[in-house]
Amino acid sequence: MHGDDNIRGVRWRHGPHIWTLSLLIGLGLGALLAGFVPQRLNESGEPVIPLWLVAPFVAILLSIALMPFVSERIWHRHFPDFSFFFGGITTGYYLRAFGGPSHGMTFGQYNVVHALVEYYSFVALVCGLFVVSGGILITIRGRGRPALNTALLAFGAVLANFVGTTGASMLLLRPYMRLNEGRLRPLHVVLFIMIVSNCGGALTPVGDPPLYLGFLKGVPFLYSLSHFWPQWALVVGLLLGVYFVVDTWYEKRHAAEVPTADPETLRPHRFGVSIEGGTGLVCLALMIAGVFIDPLLKKYAKIEGIPAGATFQLLVAAAAFFLADRRLHEANQFSFFPVKEVGLLFFGIFLTMIPALGFLSANGSALGVNNPTAYYFATGALSAFLDNAPTYLNFLQIAVAPEAVNAASIEALLSQEAGRAKLAAISTAAVFFGAATYIGNGPNFMVRTIAQTSGIRMPSFFGYLFLAIIILVPILILNWFIFIR
């Protein structure tokens, strides 16, 4: 495939040796900057995170958004270098500048290690589910029509709460594209991302990472389902309505553009669904089970801080790949290019997010975040550009301050009506606003890459953001007006 050829070229001509050089240059520059900037401590003796340290994160976002326009060829060959360089700047600065003690390490070391562990878990889940789903072939017999497509996306929104937004996206994207071969437009995929890859997963901790982190911290497992389902129904229902209108318009336009088409091709086919890949289905169940390994180890064996669940998921993904029927891989047009692109880009994103999240954690309460409306829009705005899971935790910390986020503080928060309103604002905003950009939630970028390697010309970073502003944001404002304010 074209994308594979690109990444293969990167690997051999601009591979790990050049990536390492880019990382080392970034580390050196970050360490050099740390030597010129005096460090300050707050009243608690912790380092003050300067706002300018967010610059590498902004730079990597601008690179993702603009470089494909400046030179698509340079970007495809060198995007890992951008990621490693900017990630290296942040890492070098933290390791040299922040030498105070924290959790048995220096403050800088702890934050870098914590970010890398989160990155490892992210890659294990997102890329692991992609590999596993490549060995599952779902065939939907019929022709893509507005009603059928809308029903499929509605099913995906429900499924996301059982296998996660990433799992639902990876399972349904390929059959969705095959069902609509010849009539699929970029907006079809954009709405798939909004509905299946994000907003659909707002009902259970399995659905989306922010809710899972809330569950680990003490939010009851069924709390989201029992309290957020009206918001889920409103947002998902309106997005499905938009999808149906858009797809109906495309259907009429497509029919008008092919007036001489064979009537047989326009006649509805008998509907049917078949699923192949029993090994992949077993591995999918194991991948979801892997999500619960770390909390179980913490609860019953008092073991924490070791990403055992992520390691288990990677082993399951490897087994799924080697045991899969190659015929199913070929039918799914399986390629490792999406895994490579997401894995390499998010390496830099996770590292450069460290100061952004640190600044938010230290200054959130001073930024006027003290009511449900402020929590909703602040959590949402940052979830669109930062990873929505740590953003959720940071605002949850602000909500329970000065207590730490734990089962006791969560119970106290939920015992008050104002506390429940804050949690609703934080939780729904983190999930829903994650759909506003390609990097707001794990599966977004993966879906975009799969679609592009299949020949669909997806919107740019800013193009997608523009569509989110005119489609998604009005719906989320309506959600605020009805349920949050």
Question: In which residue ranges do the predicted regions lie?
Answer:
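Intrinsically disordered, low-complexity non-transmembrane regions of multi-pass membrane transporters
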Residues: M1-Q39, E43-L53, F57, G88-I89, ...
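Transmembrane alpha-helix boundary signature
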Residues: L33-E43, F69-R73, T91-Y119, F130-A147, ...
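Hydrophobic mid-bilayer segments of alpha-helices in multi-pass membrane transport proteins
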Residues: W52-I64, H78-Y94, Y119-L129, E276-L286, ...
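Alpha-helical transmembrane segments
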Residues: H114-V126, Y223-V242, A301-L315, F377-A384, ...
